């Protein structure tokens, strides 16, 4: 990768376990629950009495481990796993995690969810001092920082490295005798800790993975925290006290599974509240509510309950196609929208439809769905979005890193309405979003990062700053 501001970057899912004889198999099941967070590649690294073993490849988890022998060989009582979407770096096997590093004095595995905002500067400095990178992923940078630290203890080395990298990150580090887990100072990415019946400790991007393996949730990892897990138990520490919660609001809006809980808030419940608040802000007459499956169904329920309108199944999704936001090229997204949804004419014909969707990024999906509903006979289609207008890029690990690819950054609400062919377009207010999610915290914006909506980033953008400032002067329309 060249570390410029580039489009189509997203997030991943990580899972780890310490202290179970079936660690790799449980990691497989955990990753299966996180498959929605990335479909380009997957991998598992196991720890068998200090011996690290790994299998990784391109494709879905089931494809990567299609041969049972590849999972069976990953013996040991500790494991970390990763499902990947190309946050940074090219889509190749070399960039599939977990990474494994073997130096003359240490070996360890690494899994990372997020994006580093000072990766270019750090990589340049590391290479200048002799570091050799085996991938184009920014995730590899932390390993070189750990290796080159002069701190006398391993934990000291890890803390120093974590204090050097900037951006949004959740790290799982598998060493010979311990698993170390950490979050960035703002906790942009979700990460939770659980416990198995036998005492094994598990870590996951989302709590939905705990249900599958029978683990009990203990607590969420805190911003700036270092969690050390070994045979003696769990130790909680910090590499910085300069922390302030600003978790990605898109986790609640779109990314996370409805059955996951993040910072004490159930995702389905938050989305229902978003839908209810959206109904209070909606100003048009309608007959039925139709949610775009699957991530908008919770918001549609809340909208219908608040408005008193019937919630109908006016759109059917082919469950065997990939999520369009996560596919890595615009051409694939266009094809994906055509393949994934069908309108139910018997439900929408002659009706004024409120079409609930979670967000509008490029407008590709919204325009096609409005067209589908009108072709099926809907007399009016009013688009109601369960999030504010997405007008600013994200640099902490989401699939939007240039303003040029955001329709709301380049068009007014009325222009966007015309482009997507809707009879009206309503976005949820930022205040409505914050209140709907309702994290119990004193942090600004209710503990959420809402920079995608208002352009106020919680941290400096480092290597991305200059390009971002330049992009603010540009206005692009990709619709003619």
Predicted regions and their residues:
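A short acidic (Asp/Glu
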Residues: 55-56, 183-184, 299-302, 393-395
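Secondary-structure transition/capping motifs at alpha-helix termini
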Residues: 131, 151-152, 283-287, 305-312, ...
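Conserved short alpha-helical segments that host acidic/polar catalytic motifs at enzyme active sites
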Residues: 1-223, 228-286, 292, 380
């Amino acid at each position: 990768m060249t570390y410029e501001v580039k489009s189509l970057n997203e997030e991943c899912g990580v899972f780890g376990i310490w202290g179970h004889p079936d660690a790799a198999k449980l990691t497989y099941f955990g990753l299966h629950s996180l498959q929605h967070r990335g479909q380009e590649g997957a991998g598992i690294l196991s720890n068998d009495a200090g011996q690290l073993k790994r299998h990784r490849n391109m494709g879905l988890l089931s494809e990567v481990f299609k041969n049972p022998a590849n999972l069976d060989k990953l013996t040991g009582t500790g494991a970390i796993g990763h499902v990947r979407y190309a946050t940074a770096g090219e889509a190749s096997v070399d960039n599939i995690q977990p990474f494994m590093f073997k130096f003359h004095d240490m070996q360890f595995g690494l899994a990372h969810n997020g994006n580093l905002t000072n990766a270019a500067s750090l990589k340049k400095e590391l290479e200048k001092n002799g570091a050799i990178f085996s991938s184009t992923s920014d995730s590899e940078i932390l390993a070189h920082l750990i290796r080159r630290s002069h701190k006398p203890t391993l934990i000291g080395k890890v803390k120093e490295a974590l204090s050097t990298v900037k951006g949004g990150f959740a790290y799982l580090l598998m060493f010979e005798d311990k698993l170390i887990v950490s979050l960035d100072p703002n906790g942009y990415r979700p990460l939770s800790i659980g416990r198995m019946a036998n005492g094994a400790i598990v870590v996951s991007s989302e709590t939905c993975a705990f249900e599958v393996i029978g683990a009990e949730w203990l607590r969420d990892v805190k911003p700036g925290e270092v969690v050390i897990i070994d045979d003696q138990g769990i130790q909680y520490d910090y590499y910085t006290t300069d922390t302030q919660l600003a978790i990605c609001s898109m986790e609640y809006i779109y990314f996370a599974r409805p059955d996951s809980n993040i910072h004490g808030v159930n995702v389905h419940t938050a989305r229902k509240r978003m839908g209810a608040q959206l109904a209070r802000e909606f100003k048009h007459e309608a007959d039925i509510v139709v949610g775009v499956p699957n991530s908008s169904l919770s918001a549609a329920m809340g909208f219908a309950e608040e408005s008193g309108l019937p919630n109908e199944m006016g759109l059917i999704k082919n469950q065997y196609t990939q999520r369009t936001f996560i596919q890595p090229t615009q051409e694939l997204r266009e094809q994906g929208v055509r393949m994934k949804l069908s309108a139910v004419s018997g439900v929408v014909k002659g009706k004024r439809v409120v079409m609930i969707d979670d967000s509008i990024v490029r407008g590709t999906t919204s325009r096609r769905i409005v067209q589908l509903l009108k072709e099926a006979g809907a007399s009016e289609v009013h688009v109601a979005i369960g999030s504010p207008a997405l007008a600013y890029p994200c640099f902490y690990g989401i699939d939007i890193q240039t303003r040029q690819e955001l329709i709301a950054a380049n068009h007014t609400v009325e222009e966007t309405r015309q482009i997507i062919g809707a009879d009206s377009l309503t976005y949820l207010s930022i205040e409505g979003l914050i209140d709907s999610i309702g994290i119990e915290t004193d942090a600004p914006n209710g503990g959420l990062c809402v920079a995608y909506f208002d352009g106020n980033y919680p941290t400096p953008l480092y290597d991305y700053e200059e390009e971002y400032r330049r992009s603010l002067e540009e206005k692009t329309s990709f619709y003619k």
